[in-house]
Amino acid sequence: MKFFALAALFASTVNSIAVDGLIPGARVIPANDVVALKKAGAYHQKHHHRRTVIIRSSSSDEDDVSADFLWGIKRANHGGRLLLQNGKKYVIGKKLDLTFLKDIEVQLDGELKFTNDVPYWQANNFYYDFQKSISFWRWGGEDIKIFGSGVLNGNGQRWYNEFAGQEILDPNNKYYRPILFVTENATRVSVEGITQLNSPCWTNFFVRTKDISFDNVFIHAYSTNASALPKNTDGFDTLNVDGLTVTNTRVDIGDDCLSPKPNTTNVFVKNLWCNGTHGASMGSIGQYPGVLDIIENVWIENVTLLNGENGARLKAWAGPDVGYGRINNVTYKNIHVENTDNPIVLDQCYFNINATQCAAYPSRVNFTNIVFEDIYGTSSGKRGKVVADLTCSPNAVCSGIRLKNIHLTSPAGSPPVIVCDGIQGDIGVECQSSSNSTTRRSVDLARSLKYRA
């Protein structure tokens, strides 16, 4: 009996070591060891002390620490913190399922960088049917906090080079590119202070997520190859999300600065700076046949939009096989635009559908209770004198559309033109139909250049 008892104790001890023992290069600092926390860089005035886990860093861009990172996440879960230290690089070369999280912090002060092994990632990823999206990893659970002064690096240049000339929404596209940061089935997620760099595709995608916030984040995507731009690198995309807050954030990318997508509610954005983007957009929605999509209860305030295609934009699909829905109760307030092609636009002829096709198969997405207030600055002049194009589909309702204190000019000349077609009721400012002969030339120019992503 003693032999069996000793054997059982030995087995139990071995299992305990396997689960709880440290892996090479790792250590755990207790929450009450303030001296050690300060020395490691984990002491933070704004965040409470926590049990802090440190893992080894990569010795080169080929040194994959995915297994170490996963171990560190599991060890820090349930009340701890994973510290990725300043001046160190952590290379991730394997897909990671992080949907088991509860009460965890990740302090990113170093660089977390994905490999650019295109064949591996295209064969090993998390796939989403919506617009054929894939991701390196996915984060889920509840009470997840990521903060620090470090960089989350998507290492996108190879992806940009190889995707050049292709289109993400082409039905024949098979070159899928990973999204940099994805949450799925997550509640109460916050991201603060970090930089998100060179995502291969969208920068952030939140799926079935509730109450997620970004504050003081810098999102940047650039290419060293002038013929291979960082396409489709949206700042924020959502699907089935309730509660998104973005504050004090800068976005310098090649697509939508902000783009809530189907079934997104309760969005708050304040102090957002966007350069070279496709705008602070709502949508697109209504893409899939027979599917109801909504975006509702959105407040966007104090936004600067520079050198982009669009400023404040709502977009919905049209065509023979599309869905239906609504964008309702959206306010854009105190929006500054400079050198922007379309400062204000309601686009119900999305995506890559010309005016003739759009007239034959109009959108079935309603735009209701949309306010544009205190919008000022200059267009690029590429659309002539048109500074706002508000054109509603004959199959949809556009009501409660209001413009207040609009001070927009165009280098193409004065007076600036606001176009409104198919809008129910008074919009609050003087506007002209696109059929007006004095505006037709500018409108035709605007729309000939608008039918693109």
UniProtKB/Swiss-Prot annotation:
GO biological process, one term: pectin catabolic process
Keyword Cell wall biogenesis/degradation: yes
Principal location class: secreted
Enzyme Commission no: 3.2.1.67
Recorded GO MF terms: galacturan 1,4-alpha-galacturonidase activity; polygalacturonase activity
Keywords assigned by UniProt, alphabetized: Cell wall biogenesis/degradation, Disulfide bond, Glycoprotein, Glycosidase, Hydrolase, Repeat, Secreted, Signal
Glycosylated residues (UniProt): 185, 225, 263, 275, 302, 329, 354, 366, 436
Disulphide-bridged cysteine pairs: 257-274, 392-398
Enzyme class: hydrolase
Example of a GO cellular component annotation carried by this entry: extracellular region
Cellular localization per UniProt: Secreted
Domain of life according to the entry: Eukaryota
Name of a matching Pfam family: Glyco_hydro_28
Function recorded in the entry: Specific in hydrolyzing the terminal glycosidic bond of polygalacturonic acid and oligogalacturonates.
Protein's name in the database: Probable exopolygalacturonase B
